[in-house]
Amino acid sequence: MLDSKLVRTQLQEIVGRLATRGFQLDVARFESLEAQRKAVQTRTEQLQAERNARSKTIGQAKSRGEDIAPLLAEVDRMGSDLEAGKRELDAIQAELDALMLSIPNLPHESVPVGADEEDNVEVRRWGVPRTFDFAIKDHVALGERHGWLDFETAAKLSGARFALMRGPIARLHRALAQFMLDLHTGEHGYEEAYTPYLVQAPALQGTGQLPKFEEDLFKISREGEADFYLIPTAEVSLTNIVAGEILDARQLPLKFVAHTPCFRSEAGASGRDTRGMIRQHQFDKVEMVRIVDPAKSYEALEELTANAEKVLQRLELPYRVLALCTGDMGFSATKTYDLEVWVPSQDKYREISSCSNCGDFQARRMQARWRNPETGKPELVHTLNGSGLAVGRTLVAVLENYQQADGSIRVPEVLKPYMGGIEVIG
């Protein structure tokens, strides 16, 4: 959530920066609610001051032996008016809060301005896509060859956009996740966490999925109890570890990593990536989250992105890094890098990781703070998150990039210890 004081004092600048994201702030509504809030707040404060003064008068009149019944009646009336004013102020503030929760983060000045993914800027590439001397297969054909990747049975169980993995491919999927966790904990300094897969609405509001993107979530309604939501990413549970906390400066940076399933309705993805594992309702992801000193968050973004890149480098998978433009960034991000891995069957790079600095946007929603030793006061932290990596899409890339002419798959060198020494699948 943006700082409401910043929006009030720099409204036109904020409107302009949001417009680069394709977001049109309802200025008339904001100014109307602000005017109402100020008027009611002023009236309520004046009424409170008058009531306090009248209350003092009652004591003085009583000591003089005067009839205080009229004064008591007036104070009671003022009390009723004051309660009504507070209720009105609360209602206006609730509308303002709802409006503020609908506004995306401001793009950092270094973010390229653009409308959509066509305006993203390539930053660098690593590796060279392999040249095949045989007709390549996609991951679906490779996986179904021995029944180790079974979309038909998955559809029987759960419908479209699910996968059933068996045998060596299931093991390879597990090996990838274990390798990613070991790399991030052993070399990159992250603390592994096991988090709930079900969270309540405040956690999703804290990281920005609610209230705006509820249709993208799977919701479990419970009669008489708070609803549950299946996590769309471990970013939600990991980042909310610090919700409502005031951290000591010595605790920063916090670096968490978790391997979880992720659940998404893919409400806006009708007709896209209907074949295979690229876009699923349920998929595994290794997620990295950092909680940092605000002065160090952009440096932390570069490190976070490098951590995700290291996974692809160790797997020897060609990839590129994109700086997302203003119109393609996620709701909570102020700056984002996407990693795209080479997918031979599609002859193009596909997203496999998104690494974002959210600044104080999520922290303000969560009230996650640290005590700044220079001021001695609690201040908002900065939060970052990134995929390190999406396990299913990494599996797709491994299957396709390591395929051989006979349809078998070479196991990447770095995964062999996790595969019991198996060198070839199929």
Swiss-Prot record:
SUPFAM superfamilies: Class II aaRS and biotin synthetases, tRNA-binding arm. Keywords: Aminoacyl-tRNA synthetase, ATP-binding, Cytoplasm, Ligase, Nucleotide-binding, Protein biosynthesis. One of its GO terms (biological process) is seryl-tRNA aminoacylation. The gene is serS. It comes from Azotobacter vinelandii (strain DJ / ATCC BAA-1303). The keyword Nucleotide-binding applies. Signal peptide: none annotated. NCBIfam families: serS (TIGR00414). It is found in: Cytoplasm. This is Serine--tRNA ligase. Catalyzes the attachment of serine to tRNA(Ser). Is also able to aminoacylate tRNA(Sec) with serine, to form the misacylated tRNA L-seryl-tRNA(Sec), which will be further converted into selenocysteinyl-tRNA(Sec). The keyword Protein biosynthesis applies. Its EC number is 6.1.1.11. Consists of two distinct domains, a catalytic core and a N-terminal extension that is involved in tRNA binding. ATP binds at R264, S265, E266, E351, I352, S353, S354. One of its GO terms (cellular component) is cytoplasm. One of its GO terms (molecular function) is serine-tRNA ligase activity. Belongs to the class-II aminoacyl-tRNA synthetase family. Type-1 seryl-tRNA synthetase subfamily. L-serine binds at T233, A234, E235, E287, S387. Homodimer. The tRNA molecule binds across the dimer. It comes from the Bacteria. It catalyses: tRNA(Ser) + L-serine + ATP = L-seryl-tRNA(Ser) + AMP + diphosphate + H(+); tRNA(Sec) + L-serine + ATP = L-seryl-tRNA(Sec) + AMP + diphosphate + H(+). PANTHER family: SERINE--TRNA LIGASE (PTHR43697:SF1), SERYL-TRNA SYNTHETASE (PTHR43697). Pathway: Aminoacyl-tRNA biosynthesis; selenocysteinyl-tRNA(Sec) biosynthesis; L-seryl-tRNA(Sec) from L-serine and tRNA(Sec): step 1/1.
